[in-house]
Curated annotation (Swiss-Prot):
Example GO molecular function: hydrolase activity
Extra information: 6-tuliposide A and tuliposide A-converting enzyme, which are compartmentalized in the vacuoles and plastids respectively, come into contact with each other for the enzyme reaction releasing toxic tulipalin A upon cell disruption by pathogen infection or herbivore predation.
Keywords: Amyloplast, Lyase, Plant defense, Plastid, Transit peptide
Keyword Lipoprotein assigned: no
Protein's name in the database: Tuliposide A-converting enzyme b1, amyloplastic
Record's subcellular location: Plastid, Amyloplast
Domain of life: Eukaryota
Gene encoding the protein: TCEA-B1
GO cellular component terms attached to this protein's record: amyloplast
Family: Belongs to the AB hydrolase superfamily.
Cited InterPro entries: AB_hydrolase_3 (IPR013094), AB_hydrolase_fold (IPR029058), Carboxylest/Gibb_receptor (IPR050466)
Transit peptide: 1-68
Amino acid sequence: MSVALFCGPPPAVSFGCKDGRGRKGMVRSKDIVRQTVKPPAHACRLIGWNKYPGSVVPTNSSLSPSPTALDDEIELDLSPFLIIYKDGRIERLKGTTVIPACPEVATKDVIIDPATGVSVRLYLPNVVDLPSKKLPVLVYFHGGGFVIENTGSPNYHNYLTLLAAKSGLLIVSVNYRLAPEHPIPASFDDCMAGFNWVVSHSAGPAPEPWLARHGDLTQILISGDSAGGTVTHYVLLRADAGVIEGAALVHPYFLGSKRLENQTEEDFEFHEKLWRLSTPDTEGLDDPLINPLAPGAPSLAGLKCKRAVVFVAELDFLVERGRMYYDALVKSGWGGKAELVHQEGVGHVFHLSDYSGDVSVDMMAKMVAFLRGE
């Protein structure tokens, strides 16, 4: 059995628009596939955020607007992530393509909760030469601002396939529910459920044979990028002591009510809107779920792992928040070993789209070394 980086072409149908229209000029086209998911009520009670009208209008200005024009009126524009229309449709502009799991290269999908539909994608590296060897297990949480991406997204599928091949770890990637259809804390709850599902395999009959046969449940690590890094912190606070060996937070999506010097006003306002859309009952950007350093947030001394690494990128608008998190962790009295990896000249989650660049290769090497405990 071999591990391949690519498992074949993506499905013939790509769900969601990817035509790069930007914020305006919204037109209907028979070639565009739209998601038509009705959002929860809170997503329609928006307080005047970016209500741009659609551009489909009658050619004769004396005519009344057509139903099509009315359908395309925008309630909230969060390009390049998603657009919410006044008729209730949610259109995701990226992060919706799914690459099927590939059993022939040791990847597969498993539904862990039929009630919610939460699933995981497993990545098993080549074990032909050492069939009885138990592999450390990495539980991974993908990014996407809590509103886009999934375990089958090309960037994540290809990156985790490569990571499994190079590290020799059995990887379990959690496919959690997205906002705004499923407001936070649904995503956090789903990721915690995915983590607990993995841990449960150490306490009796194991429902998943790959984990039972090949997983070393005494060596569990967790990791996530962007929003997945936020979830990683959440899980570290709630896991049982002694269960997690190590944690890697990659460009973690931490926010705060104070705009930092490296953050533009546009970026700051965009992510505030995104967070409020995802979390209707939020306290704002100092909600401990998104700002682990906010007043009243749980102490970082309570993280349940032996070692941790925080990756930050120089050109990422989140870089200073990541640094602040690392500094606070070191000063918290936490008893583990912490490491900060700062990479220059690159931006947010650059490593998901570039595997061959020098900085990406260096990052992969550092990640593999951390996961292996080297």
